[in-house]
């Protein structure tokens, strides 16, 4: 197998890789690094934990060493935590260069960030929203000379969903030069990325991992069928089991909402499990602190929303538990990708209720693998059921007393104001839209009822026997 030197990296970068314990390039690095060094645009799609970040960091650092200036490279990423992680890779691998980087994410002081940008760092790592804000409000820097534009977790950046980056990306793309190298990396190849691949006119290099399954082989994936009302008791039982069986067991539990995340964290702490939470309702400093405590093993359990499902590289994670079955298979792939990284073993357990069977089937179809059922002692779960339900209710009451929902609403309003929207006007629009949808639904129901009545009437008419025609008088006399 070719080494880092054989695929075109300079000796100083090969030495940096050796010091970090990177002995051989991974398949995605073998495929993409030579193409990037040749100056080609690149679209790389590989499993989580396969070394995608180093696949673009290494060639960018080599090109930067040949002609160092700022701003040389812009990296866009969907989450703040991932931005800091990418910056860490640039710093470690680019240490001999005296690399200057700048992280532009929400939740931090904009004035301090603007000052950093004005100093022309070599590499800017940013979330689209905050960088677009700077481009709209500041003229102390420009990006007209950047050589590389990187989109990490490109599927998330380009897909239109609950967080739509389209407007911000348009602002950013208008600010960068047309002549540049564009690198897109993702763990899931979505329809949007396929479309981009087909529309590209400059023949970009495309690399996709050839695998029969979409998750790594070292990952033991199972599901646990549980009734909705006793899900939390099964969760507590699972956590206790893993803590007993595995020494220094490190667990990430994924939930679907900030509120559930906070409640579960409070609940597990009541059961004396060392737990921290990570969700978008937390201040940025609190999020950093939670991640740092989990990474350093001060706390062994991290309960998180999908803000932690992408890109975060915490090699020691042994178990991922999905408290809810993900609604999209690609979310499942990113979640379970937080364990079994870089060749290590890992386990992923998904709690599936009676309402989630179709979601489980969709996941199995996407990853081209059937999940094995995990069997637990139901009697042991029933023993703690009442206690878990009581503790959960106590935590809910405590959270309600802290006005958690009100804070969430205030945060939403703040975000709207930052985006230049009127919160009251937006609420009015939503109410009007809901009213129109309701009217449309009623109209469709009436049309449906009318069509069904007409159909039923025509069926009755068709089912009646034809009436015999009365004989003409002349014919009747002739017969007599």
Curated annotation (Swiss-Prot):
Residues 218-382 form the Helicase C-terminal domain. Residues 438-480 are annotated as: Disordered. InterPro entries: DEAD/DEAH_box_helicase_dom (IPR011545), DEAD_box_RNA_helicase (IPR050079), Helicase_ATP-bd (IPR014001), Helicase_C-like (IPR001650), P-loop_NTPase (IPR027417), RNA-helicase_DEAD-box_CS (IPR000629), RNA_helicase_DEAD_Q_motif (IPR014014). This is Probable ATP-dependent RNA helicase DDX49. Pfam families: DEAD, Helicase_C. The gene is Ddx49. A motif (Q motif) lies at residues 2-30. Coiled coil: none annotated. Belongs to the DEAD box helicase family. DDX49/DBP8 subfamily. ATP binds at residues 46-53. GO terms for biological process: positive regulation of cell growth; regulation of rRNA stability. Its main location: nucleus. GO terms for cellular component: nucleolus; nucleoplasm. Its EC number is 3.6.4.13. Keywords: ATP-binding, Helicase, Hydrolase, Nucleotide-binding, Nucleus, RNA-binding.
